[in-house]
Amino acid sequence: MLAQIRRGITGSEGLASNSPRKAKQEEQREGRRERTMKSPICDMLGIEFPLLAFSHCRDVVAAVSRAGGFGVLGATVHTPATLERELKWIDDHVDGKPYGIDVLIPENISTAGEKDVTWKSLEARVPQEHRKYTSDLLKKYDIELTTTEVADNQPQPFDAKTALELLKVSFNHPIRLIANALGVPPKAMIEMGKKHNVPVAALVGAKEHALRQVAAGVDILVVQGTEAGGHCGEVSTLVLVPEVIKAIKPIRNVPVLAAGGIMTGRQMAACMAMGAAGAWTGSVWLATVESETSEIFREKMIAASSRDAIRSKGRTGKPARQLRSVWTDAWDRAPDSPGALPMPLQSIISRDAFNSIDRAAAAGNARARDLVSYFVGQGVGLIDSVKSAGAVVQEFKEEFAEAVEHMNALVAE
Protein backbone atom coordinates (compact mmCIF):
# COMPACT_ATOMS: atom_id res chain seq x y z
CA MET A 1 0.00 0.00 0.00
CA LEU A 2 2.78 2.44 0.94
CA ALA A 3 4.55 2.11 -2.39
CA GLN A 4 1.27 2.31 -4.29
CA ILE A 5 0.31 5.56 -2.59
CA ARG A 6 3.76 7.02 -3.12
CA ARG A 7 3.72 6.02 -6.76
CA GLY A 8 0.34 7.62 -7.26
CA ILE A 9 1.31 10.95 -5.73
CA THR A 10 4.94 11.22 -6.79
CA GLY A 11 5.23 9.21 -9.97
CA SER A 12 8.41 7.67 -8.53
CA GLU A 13 9.13 4.01 -7.86
CA GLY A 14 12.47 4.72 -6.21
CA LEU A 15 10.88 5.98 -3.01
CA ALA A 16 9.63 2.49 -2.24
CA SER A 17 13.00 0.76 -2.31
CA ASN A 18 12.71 -0.40 1.30
CA SER A 19 9.21 -1.86 0.95
CA PRO A 20 8.79 -5.64 1.36
CA ARG A 21 6.62 -5.57 -1.75
CA LYS A 22 9.47 -4.25 -3.89
CA ALA A 23 9.67 -7.32 -6.14
CA LYS A 24 5.98 -7.16 -6.95
CA GLN A 25 6.23 -3.43 -7.59
CA GLU A 26 9.06 -3.98 -10.06
CA GLU A 27 6.91 -6.44 -11.97
CA GLN A 28 4.08 -3.92 -12.16
CA ARG A 29 6.25 -0.95 -13.11
CA GLU A 30 6.04 -1.45 -16.87
CA GLY A 31 2.97 0.12 -18.36
CA ARG A 32 1.79 1.69 -15.10
CA ARG A 33 0.49 5.21 -15.61
CA GLU A 34 1.14 8.00 -13.13
CA ARG A 35 -2.01 8.56 -11.10
CA THR A 36 -3.36 11.36 -8.99
CA MET A 37 -5.02 11.00 -5.63
CA LYS A 38 -8.77 10.55 -5.44
CA SER A 39 -9.77 13.93 -4.07
CA PRO A 40 -12.36 16.42 -5.35
CA ILE A 41 -9.71 19.11 -4.93
CA CYS A 42 -7.39 17.30 -7.35
CA ASP A 43 -10.25 17.08 -9.85
CA MET A 44 -11.31 20.72 -9.45
CA LEU A 45 -7.82 22.18 -9.67
CA GLY A 46 -6.12 19.69 -11.96
CA ILE A 47 -3.36 18.73 -9.52
CA GLU A 48 -1.63 15.52 -8.41
CA PHE A 49 -1.59 16.09 -4.66
CA PRO A 50 -4.15 18.19 -2.71
CA LEU A 51 -1.59 20.37 -0.94
CA LEU A 52 -2.23 24.10 -1.38
CA ALA A 53 0.52 26.57 -0.50
CA PHE A 54 -0.34 30.18 0.27
CA SER A 55 2.60 32.54 -0.17
CA HIS A 56 3.33 36.17 -0.98
CA CYS A 57 6.37 34.96 -2.93
CA ARG A 58 6.03 34.08 -6.60
CA ASP A 59 9.02 31.73 -6.40
CA VAL A 60 7.29 29.60 -3.76
CA VAL A 61 4.04 29.54 -5.75
CA ALA A 62 5.77 28.34 -8.91
CA ALA A 63 7.97 25.80 -7.12
CA VAL A 64 5.06 24.18 -5.28
CA SER A 65 2.94 23.90 -8.41
CA ARG A 66 5.83 22.42 -10.38
CA ALA A 67 6.28 19.82 -7.63
CA GLY A 68 2.67 18.61 -7.89
CA GLY A 69 0.98 20.81 -5.30
CA PHE A 70 -0.89 24.06 -5.88
CA GLY A 71 0.66 27.47 -5.23
CA VAL A 72 -1.59 30.38 -4.23
CA LEU A 73 -0.21 33.92 -4.51
CA GLY A 74 -1.23 36.46 -1.88
CA ALA A 75 -2.28 39.39 -4.07
CA THR A 76 -3.42 41.93 -1.49
CA VAL A 77 0.00 43.59 -1.18
CA HIS A 78 0.02 44.40 -4.91
CA THR A 79 -1.29 47.09 -7.18
CA PRO A 80 -2.86 45.95 -10.46
CA ALA A 81 0.40 46.82 -12.25
CA THR A 82 2.69 44.90 -9.90
CA LEU A 83 0.33 41.93 -9.82
CA GLU A 84 0.40 41.79 -13.62
CA ARG A 85 4.20 41.51 -13.50
CA GLU A 86 4.10 38.81 -10.82
CA LEU A 87 1.54 36.68 -12.65
CA LYS A 88 3.43 37.02 -15.92
CA TRP A 89 6.54 35.75 -14.14
CA ILE A 90 4.63 32.81 -12.66
CA ASP A 91 3.20 31.95 -16.07
CA ASP A 92 6.75 31.81 -17.43
CA HIS A 93 8.11 29.66 -14.58
CA VAL A 94 5.32 27.29 -13.57
CA ASP A 95 5.80 24.88 -16.50
CA GLY A 96 2.11 24.99 -17.36
CA LYS A 97 1.04 23.76 -13.92
CA PRO A 98 -2.01 25.32 -12.23
CA TYR A 99 -1.92 28.02 -9.55
CA GLY A 100 -4.29 30.51 -7.91
CA ILE A 101 -4.51 33.86 -6.12
CA ASP A 102 -5.78 35.05 -2.74
CA VAL A 103 -7.23 38.46 -1.84
CA LEU A 104 -8.43 40.04 1.40
CA ILE A 105 -11.81 41.76 1.40
CA PRO A 106 -12.81 42.20 5.07
CA GLU A 107 -16.49 42.44 5.92
CA ASN A 108 -15.86 44.08 9.28
CA ILE A 109 -13.58 47.08 8.93
CA SER A 110 -13.75 50.46 10.63
CA THR A 111 -14.18 52.26 7.30
CA ALA A 112 -16.99 50.01 6.04
CA GLY A 113 -19.56 51.97 4.06
CA GLU A 114 -17.31 54.97 3.51
CA LYS A 115 -16.47 56.06 -0.01
CA ASP A 116 -13.16 57.18 -1.48
CA VAL A 117 -11.08 56.31 1.58
CA THR A 118 -7.38 56.71 0.82
CA TRP A 119 -4.22 55.80 2.68
CA LYS A 120 -3.53 59.50 3.32
CA SER A 121 -6.99 60.14 4.69
CA LEU A 122 -6.45 57.27 7.11
CA GLU A 123 -3.07 58.64 8.17
CA ALA A 124 -4.86 61.76 9.35
CA ARG A 125 -7.03 59.62 11.66
CA VAL A 126 -4.15 58.01 13.53
CA PRO A 127 -4.00 59.58 17.02
CA GLN A 128 -0.80 61.39 17.96
CA GLU A 129 -0.65 59.22 21.08
CA HIS A 130 -0.21 56.09 18.94
CA ARG A 131 2.37 57.75 16.70
CA LYS A 132 4.46 58.84 19.68
CA TYR A 133 4.18 55.44 21.32
CA THR A 134 5.50 53.78 18.17
CA SER A 135 8.33 56.26 17.70
CA ASP A 136 9.41 56.03 21.34
CA LEU A 137 9.37 52.23 21.22
CA LEU A 138 11.68 52.11 18.22
CA LYS A 139 14.01 54.72 19.74
CA LYS A 140 14.57 52.43 22.73
CA TYR A 141 16.12 49.96 20.29
CA ASP A 142 18.14 52.53 18.34
CA ILE A 143 15.80 52.39 15.36
CA GLU A 144 14.90 55.49 13.41
CA LEU A 145 11.27 55.46 12.32
CA THR A 146 11.12 56.46 8.68
CA THR A 147 7.90 57.00 6.79
CA THR A 148 7.03 56.05 3.24
CA GLU A 149 5.44 58.71 1.10
CA VAL A 150 2.26 57.54 -0.59
CA ALA A 151 0.30 58.97 -3.50
CA ASP A 152 -2.71 61.12 -2.71
CA ASN A 153 -5.01 58.57 -4.33
CA GLN A 154 -3.44 55.39 -2.92
CA PRO A 155 -6.33 53.21 -1.67
CA GLN A 156 -6.67 52.20 1.95
CA PRO A 157 -5.31 48.81 3.05
CA PHE A 158 -7.68 45.91 2.36
CA ASP A 159 -9.68 48.01 -0.09
CA ALA A 160 -12.55 46.05 -1.71
CA LYS A 161 -12.53 48.06 -4.95
CA THR A 162 -8.81 47.45 -5.40
CA ALA A 163 -9.28 43.74 -4.68
CA LEU A 164 -11.81 43.44 -7.49
CA GLU A 165 -9.40 45.24 -9.83
CA LEU A 166 -6.76 42.69 -8.87
CA LEU A 167 -9.18 39.91 -9.78
CA LYS A 168 -9.73 41.43 -13.21
CA VAL A 169 -5.98 41.41 -13.79
CA SER A 170 -5.77 37.82 -12.58
CA PHE A 171 -8.39 36.56 -15.01
CA ASN A 172 -6.11 37.58 -17.87
CA HIS A 173 -3.90 34.72 -16.71
CA PRO A 174 -4.59 30.95 -16.47
CA ILE A 175 -5.44 30.95 -12.76
CA ARG A 176 -7.39 27.96 -11.44
CA LEU A 177 -8.58 29.34 -8.08
CA ILE A 178 -9.50 32.61 -6.37
CA ALA A 179 -9.67 32.74 -2.58
CA ASN A 180 -10.88 35.33 -0.10
CA ALA A 181 -10.41 35.78 3.63
CA LEU A 182 -12.02 37.83 6.41
CA GLY A 183 -15.60 37.45 5.30
CA VAL A 184 -18.04 36.35 2.61
CA PRO A 185 -16.67 37.21 -0.86
CA PRO A 186 -18.52 40.03 -2.59
CA LYS A 187 -21.19 38.85 -4.99
CA ALA A 188 -19.14 40.28 -7.85
CA MET A 189 -16.23 38.02 -6.93
CA ILE A 190 -18.37 34.88 -6.99
CA GLU A 191 -19.93 35.94 -10.29
CA MET A 192 -16.48 36.55 -11.81
CA GLY A 193 -15.42 33.08 -10.76
CA LYS A 194 -18.46 31.48 -12.37
CA LYS A 195 -18.01 33.53 -15.55
CA HIS A 196 -14.43 32.31 -15.95
CA ASN A 197 -15.15 28.79 -14.64
CA VAL A 198 -12.71 29.31 -11.78
CA PRO A 199 -13.61 27.94 -8.32
CA VAL A 200 -14.00 30.45 -5.48
CA ALA A 201 -12.62 29.49 -2.07
CA ALA A 202 -13.31 31.21 1.23
CA LEU A 203 -11.43 30.99 4.53
CA VAL A 204 -13.52 30.42 7.65
CA GLY A 205 -12.67 30.20 11.33
CA ALA A 206 -16.04 29.15 12.75
CA LYS A 207 -18.97 26.90 11.85
CA GLU A 208 -21.28 29.90 11.53
CA HIS A 209 -18.93 31.50 9.02
CA ALA A 210 -18.90 28.31 6.97
CA LEU A 211 -22.70 28.18 6.79
CA ARG A 212 -22.79 31.76 5.51
CA GLN A 213 -20.16 30.99 2.87
CA VAL A 214 -22.06 27.94 1.64
CA ALA A 215 -25.24 30.01 1.38
CA ALA A 216 -23.33 32.64 -0.61
CA GLY A 217 -22.28 30.03 -3.18
CA VAL A 218 -18.56 29.47 -2.65
CA ASP A 219 -17.06 26.34 -4.23
CA ILE A 220 -14.42 25.43 -1.62
CA LEU A 221 -14.14 26.07 2.11
CA VAL A 222 -10.75 26.61 3.70
CA VAL A 223 -11.48 25.69 7.31
CA GLN A 224 -8.76 27.36 9.32
CA GLY A 225 -8.13 26.58 12.97
CA THR A 226 -6.64 28.91 15.53
CA GLU A 227 -3.19 27.36 15.05
CA ALA A 228 -2.86 29.24 11.75
CA GLY A 229 -0.59 32.18 11.13
CA GLY A 230 -2.21 35.53 10.35
CA HIS A 231 -5.85 36.31 11.03
CA CYS A 232 -7.49 33.37 12.76
CA GLY A 233 -10.29 32.40 15.10
CA GLU A 234 -10.24 30.62 18.45
CA VAL A 235 -11.24 27.02 17.58
CA SER A 236 -8.58 24.38 16.87
CA THR A 237 -8.24 22.69 13.49
CA LEU A 238 -8.89 19.27 15.05
CA VAL A 239 -12.29 20.45 16.30
CA LEU A 240 -13.28 22.89 13.57
CA VAL A 241 -12.79 20.69 10.50
CA PRO A 242 -15.21 17.89 11.51
CA GLU A 243 -17.62 20.44 12.98
CA VAL A 244 -17.87 22.29 9.67
CA ILE A 245 -18.06 19.10 7.60
CA LYS A 246 -20.95 17.87 9.74
CA ALA A 247 -22.76 21.22 9.55
CA ILE A 248 -22.61 21.69 5.78
CA LYS A 249 -23.23 18.07 4.75
CA PRO A 250 -27.07 18.36 4.71
CA ILE A 251 -26.91 21.60 2.71
CA ARG A 252 -24.48 21.16 -0.15
CA ASN A 253 -21.42 19.12 -1.07
CA VAL A 254 -18.60 21.64 -0.68
CA PRO A 255 -15.02 20.32 -0.48
CA VAL A 256 -13.17 21.33 2.68
CA LEU A 257 -9.49 22.17 2.87
CA ALA A 258 -8.07 21.90 6.38
CA ALA A 259 -5.81 24.74 7.51
CA GLY A 260 -4.04 25.83 10.64
CA GLY A 261 -0.78 24.41 11.99
CA ILE A 262 -0.31 21.89 9.17
CA MET A 263 3.43 21.54 8.60
CA THR A 264 3.81 17.84 7.72
CA GLY A 265 2.29 15.15 5.54
CA ARG A 266 1.25 13.26 8.66
CA GLN A 267 -0.86 16.18 9.83
CA MET A 268 -2.34 16.45 6.35
CA ALA A 269 -3.29 12.76 6.42
CA ALA A 270 -4.90 13.20 9.83
CA CYS A 271 -7.06 16.04 8.53
CA MET A 272 -8.09 14.04 5.49
CA ALA A 273 -8.98 11.14 7.77
CA MET A 274 -11.47 13.54 9.39
CA GLY A 275 -13.05 14.22 6.00
CA ALA A 276 -11.03 17.08 4.55
CA ALA A 277 -10.32 16.94 0.82
CA GLY A 278 -6.84 18.38 1.19
CA ALA A 279 -4.73 20.90 3.09
CA TRP A 280 -4.19 24.65 2.87
CA THR A 281 -0.77 25.62 4.25
CA GLY A 282 1.17 28.83 4.77
CA SER A 283 3.74 29.02 7.56
CA VAL A 284 5.75 26.01 6.38
CA TRP A 285 6.73 27.91 3.21
CA LEU A 286 8.22 30.82 5.17
CA ALA A 287 11.19 28.61 6.03
CA THR A 288 12.02 27.78 2.40
CA VAL A 289 14.96 29.15 0.43
CA GLU A 290 12.54 30.75 -2.03
CA SER A 291 10.53 32.61 0.62
CA GLU A 292 10.36 36.40 0.90
CA THR A 293 11.25 36.30 4.60
CA SER A 294 14.59 37.59 5.83
CA GLU A 295 17.40 35.36 7.03
CA ILE A 296 16.97 36.90 10.48
CA PHE A 297 13.33 35.88 10.66
CA ARG A 298 14.11 32.37 9.43
CA GLU A 299 16.65 32.03 12.22
CA LYS A 300 14.02 33.16 14.73
CA MET A 301 11.56 30.63 13.32
CA ILE A 302 14.00 27.76 13.74
CA ALA A 303 14.70 28.84 17.32
CA ALA A 304 11.01 29.30 18.20
CA SER A 305 8.61 26.92 19.91
CA SER A 306 4.92 26.60 19.16
CA ARG A 307 4.16 28.79 22.19
CA ASP A 308 6.02 31.69 20.56
CA ALA A 309 3.32 32.05 17.89
CA ILE A 310 0.74 34.28 19.56
CA ARG A 311 -2.46 36.09 18.57
CA SER A 312 -2.02 39.86 18.64
CA LYS A 313 -3.84 42.92 17.33
CA GLY A 314 -0.59 44.86 17.24
CA ARG A 315 0.03 44.51 13.52
CA THR A 316 -3.36 44.85 11.78
CA GLY A 317 -5.92 45.72 14.45
CA LYS A 318 -7.51 42.26 14.27
CA PRO A 319 -6.26 39.18 16.14
CA ALA A 320 -3.52 37.72 13.96
CA ARG A 321 -1.08 34.99 14.94
CA GLN A 322 2.53 36.05 14.61
CA LEU A 323 5.91 35.44 16.18
CA ARG A 324 6.05 37.00 19.62
CA SER A 325 8.45 39.94 19.82
CA VAL A 326 9.10 43.17 21.68
CA TRP A 327 6.53 44.74 19.32
CA THR A 328 3.70 42.38 20.27
CA ASP A 329 4.53 42.65 23.96
CA ALA A 330 4.53 46.43 23.74
CA TRP A 331 1.03 46.56 22.25
CA ASP A 332 -0.55 43.66 24.14
CA ARG A 333 1.14 43.58 27.55
CA ALA A 334 2.77 46.90 28.38
CA PRO A 335 0.84 48.93 30.99
CA ASP A 336 1.39 52.16 29.04
CA SER A 337 0.15 50.74 25.72
CA PRO A 338 -2.56 52.89 24.11
CA GLY A 339 -4.06 49.72 22.63
CA ALA A 340 -4.17 48.70 19.00
CA LEU A 341 -6.31 50.75 16.65
CA PRO A 342 -9.09 49.04 14.63
CA MET A 343 -8.36 47.67 11.17
CA PRO A 344 -7.14 49.29 8.92
CA LEU A 345 -5.68 52.09 11.10
CA GLN A 346 -3.22 49.85 12.94
CA SER A 347 -1.74 48.81 9.58
CA ILE A 348 -0.94 52.46 8.87
CA ILE A 349 1.27 52.46 11.98
CA SER A 350 2.81 49.02 11.63
CA ARG A 351 3.81 49.23 7.96
CA ASP A 352 6.40 51.98 8.42
CA ALA A 353 7.44 50.59 11.79
CA PHE A 354 8.23 47.11 10.46
CA ASN A 355 9.94 48.49 7.38
CA SER A 356 12.19 50.49 9.72
CA ILE A 357 12.74 47.49 12.01
CA ASP A 358 13.69 45.17 9.15
CA ARG A 359 16.08 47.72 7.62
CA ALA A 360 17.81 48.30 10.95
CA ALA A 361 18.16 44.58 11.64
CA ALA A 362 19.53 43.92 8.15
CA ALA A 363 22.05 46.74 8.64
CA GLY A 364 23.46 45.05 11.71
CA ASN A 365 21.48 46.58 14.57
CA ALA A 366 21.50 43.62 16.95
CA ARG A 367 18.84 45.16 19.20
CA ALA A 368 16.45 45.54 16.26
CA ARG A 369 16.33 41.75 15.97
CA ASP A 370 14.20 41.70 19.13
CA LEU A 371 11.39 43.45 17.22
CA VAL A 372 11.62 41.43 13.99
CA SER A 373 8.41 39.45 13.53
CA TYR A 374 5.99 38.18 10.92
CA PHE A 375 2.76 36.22 10.67
CA VAL A 376 3.37 32.56 11.51
CA GLY A 377 1.34 29.69 12.94
CA GLN A 378 1.88 27.44 15.95
CA GLY A 379 3.46 24.86 13.67
CA VAL A 380 6.60 27.00 13.79
CA GLY A 381 7.77 24.67 16.56
CA LEU A 382 8.14 21.92 13.94
CA ILE A 383 10.56 23.92 11.79
CA ASP A 384 14.18 22.88 12.28
CA SER A 385 15.87 23.93 9.03
CA VAL A 386 15.51 25.86 5.78
CA LYS A 387 14.68 23.75 2.72
CA SER A 388 13.60 24.26 -0.87
CA ALA A 389 9.87 24.45 -1.56
CA GLY A 390 10.12 21.43 -3.83
CA ALA A 391 11.75 19.40 -1.06
CA VAL A 392 8.95 20.37 1.33
CA VAL A 393 6.33 19.13 -1.14
CA GLN A 394 8.21 15.86 -1.51
CA GLU A 395 8.38 15.44 2.27
CA PHE A 396 4.64 16.04 2.51
CA LYS A 397 4.03 13.28 -0.04
CA GLU A 398 6.30 10.77 1.67
CA GLU A 399 4.98 11.48 5.16
CA PHE A 400 1.40 11.34 3.92
CA ALA A 401 2.03 7.92 2.42
CA GLU A 402 3.68 6.67 5.60
CA ALA A 403 0.75 7.90 7.70
CA VAL A 404 -1.77 6.11 5.50
CA GLU A 405 0.28 2.92 5.68
CA HIS A 406 0.41 3.22 9.46
CA MET A 407 -3.37 3.54 9.68
CA ASN A 408 -3.88 0.61 7.33
CA ALA A 409 -1.61 -1.51 9.51
CA LEU A 410 -3.79 -0.78 12.54
CA VAL A 411 -6.81 -2.39 10.91
CA ALA A 412 -5.07 -5.08 8.86
CA GLU A 413 -6.45 -8.60 9.27
Please provide the spans of the model-predicted regions.
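Conserved active-site-proximal phosphate/metal-binding subdomains
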Residues: D116-K132, E234-L257, M263-E413
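Cationic, low-complexity basic patches in intrinsically disordered or flexible, solvent-exposed regions
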Residues: Q25-R29
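Active-site entrance/lid segments in N-terminal catalytic domains of soluble metabolic enzymes
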Residues: E34-I251
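Residue-identity detector for glycine
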Residues: G8-G14, G31
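Thr-Gly-centered strand-to-loop micro-motif
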Residues: F54, L73, N180, A258-A259, ...
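Residue-level detector of alpha-helix initiation sites
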Residues: V184, I262-M263
